[in-house]
């Protein structure tokens, strides 16, 4: 019992033989750095150059440019009139430079002029444009249209004057409405998903293929993406619409006046208003 008490109550000190402080994670981190550096050096040394698929052995396959300086170019005073570096990168959208569509500034001017004429706010104008686009799909964009155009509010017809729409459209209303071409095409396609829908432009031309209804409005923009069959149908409808049209460069001149003074004097004895008396002879 005395021996057990001695072990229980006495204190003992433990001494390490080495003076180094041992850290369980320290040596691993130190050892990892040289290993990582050696791995990176091995990767950098072992990295090969990318294989050029255009080469075969030591021979290089030449690449040619689509536009080279060797071709004949317009020159002014011996200097080329074109910037080939810019031309190689210049690929604008067709609709942005097409003269069948009003420019963006012309459309902005028309939009603001119509809004001011109708005296409506910026938040209400898009709703009015929805109605105008659908109305133009049905009735066309002829410059000779007048009166009012109609938008439906439920079962109620709301009338708007056409005068500000046509008068402010520069160059033409059709070129202004060309900005709505893609949306109008999608709208017709949406209507056809619910029920058969053919715009009036296609009904008048007796277009029998309902799949071409999306192209049956007169402000549709023909682009490079337009299918050949749809392009042919649209051009045929346009030709039929313009066949009966007879545009006149000059109308009847309202400033008509006599070129010379008429000095003829007639009496009741004259044979006719344009012929003098025949000395007793009468006009048979």
Curated annotation (Swiss-Prot):
PTM comment: Genome polyprotein of potyviruses undergoes post-translational proteolytic processing by the main proteinase NIa-pro resulting in the production of at least ten individual proteins. The P1 proteinase and the HC-pro cleave only their respective C-termini autocatalytically. 6K1 is essential for proper proteolytic separation of P3 from CI.
Q: Which GO terms describe its cellular component?
A: viral capsid
- EC main class here is transferase
Q: What is its EC number?
A: 2.7.7.48
Point to the regions of Polar residues compositional bias. Answer: 35-44
Determine if Cytoplasm is one of this entry's keywords: no
Stretches for region Disordered: 16-57, 255-284
Reactions catalysed, as given in the entry: RNA(n) + a ribonucleoside 5'-triphosphate = RNA(n+1) + diphosphate
Site-annotated residues for Cleavage = 17-18
Q: What terms describe the molecular function in GO for this protein?
A: RNA-directed RNA polymerase activity
Note the Pfam families from the entry: Poty_coat
Q: Which UniProt keywords apply?
A: Capsid protein, Nucleotidyltransferase, RNA-directed RNA polymerase, Transferase, Virion
In terms of InterPro entries, this protein maps to:
Poty_coat
Annotated family: Belongs to the potyviridae genome polyprotein family.
- What name does UniProt use for this protein? Genome polyprotein
